Amino acid sequence: MNEEKITTSANKKLSPEEIKRVKGLGCLQDKRYDDIFNIRVITGNGHITTDEHRAIADAADKFGNGQITMTTRLSMEIQGVPYDNIEKTIAFLGEHGLMTGGTGAKVRPVVSCKGTTCQYGLIDTFALSKKIHERFYVGYHDVVLPHKFKIAVGGCPNNCVKPNLNDMGIIGQRIPKPDSEKCRGCKKCQIEKSCPVHVPKLVDGKLYIDPEECIHCGRCKGKCPFGAVPELSLIHISEPTRHAQI
């Protein structure tokens, strides 16, 4: 094991100013000890390379207790780092292109679901969340806000990452726009069959989709062989509610 690793607390008493300073660097005090901290490593949008994985694991072995956890915002947290190892840990991570942070009254790390690759994803969540990360997390890194500000990007209305519970949430959607002229009133309507919430109905021989009941999940895309349901892709931004066509 590396000689720089310290596995036990020296019970070093730290001043509130010292604790606050390192918290601003992404280092949170372990409540069980006066001088042991957990260090948050930013992933950008939950994506890291295998080389970055190895660097984080090496840092955990070298400077912490050898354990790593994931935060709810998809950052990685190196556990059990003594106060005297904090600067060494941050420097080591920096050598591998990694940064620490994600604390305080600032823009917090951006959370993204796997909509880019998920069968239900309607937008490229990885690319969008990466842009948001660079623009707001990195770009506003030194901006102190009245309170922490959280952003999440969801690929569809399944809402896996709960965008609407963040300060700003983005939800990929597809809103169907039935074309009555193309609808042939099929007895076994494929649009009806594909809807998970049973919203589409044949009314007077034509397809009707209640806009208030439709959840915009996009499951009906391409299901009508006659093209009766073209769709408009949207990003839904909650709080405040807005729509932007993509």
Q: PLM ranges: what are they?
A:
Residues 29-30, 167-172, 242:
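Short beta-strand elements
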Residues 171-175, 209-213, 232-233:
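Short cysteine/histidine-rich metal-coordination sites, predominantly Zn2+-binding motifs
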Residues 214, 218:
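Cysteine-rich micro-motifs
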Residues 28-33, 64-70, 201:
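Short, flexible, solvent-exposed loop/turn segments with mixed acidic/basic and small polar residues
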Residues 1-52:
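N-terminal basic/disordered segments at the start of proteins
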Residues 235-246:
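Single conserved hydrophobic/aromatic residue that forms the stacking wall/gate
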Residues 13, 37-177, 181-186:
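Small-residue-enriched alpha-helical segments and adjacent helix-cap loops
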Residues 188-207, 219-233:
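Iron-sulfur cluster-binding cysteine motifs and their immediate structural context
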